[in-house]
Amino acid sequence: MAHQLKLLKDDFFASDQQAVAVADRYPQDVFAEHTHDFCELVIVWRGNGLHVLNDRPYRITRGDLFYIHADDKHSYASVNDLVLQNIIYCPERLKLNLDWQGAIPGFSASAGQPHWRLGSVGMAQARQVIGQLEHESSQHVSFANEMAELLFGQLVMLLNRHRYTSDSLPPTSSETLLDKLITRLAASLKSPFALDKFCDEASCSERVLRQQFRQQTGMTINQYLRQVRVCHAQYLLQHSRLLISDISTECGFEDSNYFSVVFTRETGMTPSQWRHLNSQKD
């Protein structure tokens, strides 16, 4: 078995007193599977890519938020103008008396829900705090580490306030149409999605929404939905014993032959080949 890449604190933190830092990825390149001896928050600003976290694939784009524990293994592939930021931190170095464990999923162990989403409002507020945090964490002046930790605490609480599960916006949300569209797409894994119906409900222009979606994500709406479904199929093929025909239905494909064609085109192998290859990992 090949030696797994592990990213180390000494390469990312200025000193053993520093608890928090920001690692920009403008853009994020393909990155082989790795672990860390620190933890991180990942926020995606635009573009798209394939993020595989603990053998589960996610097609990521603007607004995706991940809580990564040191022991988690993850990688990036099939990236397309993917812009994100990693807010990296060492739990054992944090000194503020906050309920870190309650606020950060998987803070003390690789558990809890790692994947969430942020709408445009949450993204704008997070970006502002991260900018301040990045500035403080790069300073070599008195109390820079303390200021950075205060800002990190603010960011963590802000994310708690604004995050939501990928397929369920809060009913009182005032998020943009693009946020609502991405959420509706995530909730359409098993059922058909009709863009014209969505636009009628939202009283918006289908053409303008298509353009806005492509500008922000680097994909068409159909490409995104298809790839989200294929990612879910990959997960089910590896981690369930469902028949391929049943997985096809679970992932919104009415015809299993068409599912096989789409899956093969997206992954380079048939569903059966994928299942056989990845079952050897478990």
Swiss-Prot record:
Which Pfam families does the UniProt entry name for this protein? AraC_binding (PF02311), HTH_18 (PF12833)
Q: Where in the cell is it found?
A: Cytoplasm
Predominant place of localization: cytoplasm
The GO annotation for biological process reads: positive regulation of DNA-templated transcription; rhamnose metabolic process
Q: Which PROSITE patterns match?
A: HTH_ARAC_FAMILY_1, HTH_ARAC_FAMILY_2
Q: Which UniProt keywords apply?
A: Activator, Cytoplasm, DNA-binding, Repeat, Rhamnose metabolism, Transcription, Transcription regulation
Stretches assigned to the HTH araC/xylS-type domain: 179-277
Q: Which InterPro entries match?
A: AraC-bd, Homeodomain-like_sf, HTH_AraC, HTH_AraC-typ_CS, RhaR_RhaS-like_N, RmlC-like_jellyroll, RmlC_Cupin_sf, Tscrpt_act_RhaR
One of the record's GO cellular component terms? cytoplasm
Q: Name one GO molecular function term.
A: sequence-specific DNA binding
The feature of type site (Interaction with sigma-70) is located at 246
The residue ranges marked as DNA-binding region are 196-217, 244-267
Would you say which domain of life the source belongs to?
Answer: Bacteria
The free-text function statement in the UniProt record for this protein reads:
Activates expression of the rhaSR operon in response to L-rhamnose.
Assembly information from the UniProt record = Binds DNA as a dimer.
What HAMAP family would the database entry show?
Answer: HTH_type_RhaR
The name of this protein is HTH-type transcriptional activator RhaR
